Amino acid sequence: MLIFDEVITGLRLSDGGASKYFGVTPDMTTLGKIVGGGMPLACYGGKLEIMQCVAPLGSVYQAGTLSGNPCAVAAGIETIRQIESIPNFYEELDRKSAMIENAIREKGLNVNRCGSLMTVFFNDERVKSYDEARACNTESYGRYYRHMLQSGIYTACLLYTSPSPRD
C-alpha cells in the first residue's frame, strides 16, 4: 500500500498535491490544515476498496474532536475558492518561488526548491539526502535563522501568490 502524507505538499505543489505534481497515484492520501485554510482541519482519502472499510460501511471506526468543525470547513471551502479564482495559480506561485530562489542564490547560498517549498542549506552542493543535510554547517544556519527572525522574516513560512516582486 502506498500512502502519501500531503500535510506539507497538499495544495502547495499542485491542486492534486505531490501526487499530481509527480504523476504518482497513491492508495491513500492525508492532508493537513491547508485544506482548512490554516484552521484545524485534516482529511484523508483513498481508493474505493480501502475507504469502504471505514464506518459506516466498514468495520474501521474513525472520529476526531474537531471532525466537521463548521468554521474550519468554511475556511477550507474558501481556500479552494480562492485558489480556483486566481488564473494560473500554480504557475504564478512557481514563478514567484523561482524569483525568491534566485535572490537567495545571488547571495551565494544553496537552496533546494520543489514548487513553492524551499529551504536554505549552508554547504557547497545541492543537498540530495538526509546525510548531506546533516553535514551542512548548522552553526551558520543558526546565525542566518536568528538574523532573519530579528529582521522580521520568517523562513519557515510557505509562499503564496500575494507577494509582489517588491516584497
Regions found by a protein language model. Give the residues of each.
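Conserved PLP phosphate-binding loop immediately N-terminal to the Schiff-base lysine helix
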Residues: M1-F22, M28, I34
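Active-site PLP attachment segment
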Residues: V24-C53, G68-A75
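Short beta-alpha connecting loops at secondary-structure transitions
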Residues: D27-T30, P56-T65, S85, Y130-A133
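Structural motif of enzymes handling amino- and sulfur-group chemistry
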Residues: L66-I86
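Structural signature of PLP-dependent enzymes
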Residues: T79-N102, Y130-T138
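Conserved PLP-binding catalytic core of the aspartate aminotransferase-like
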Residues: A98, L109-R143
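Conserved small/polar residues in nucleotide/adenosyl-binding loops
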Residues: Y160-D167
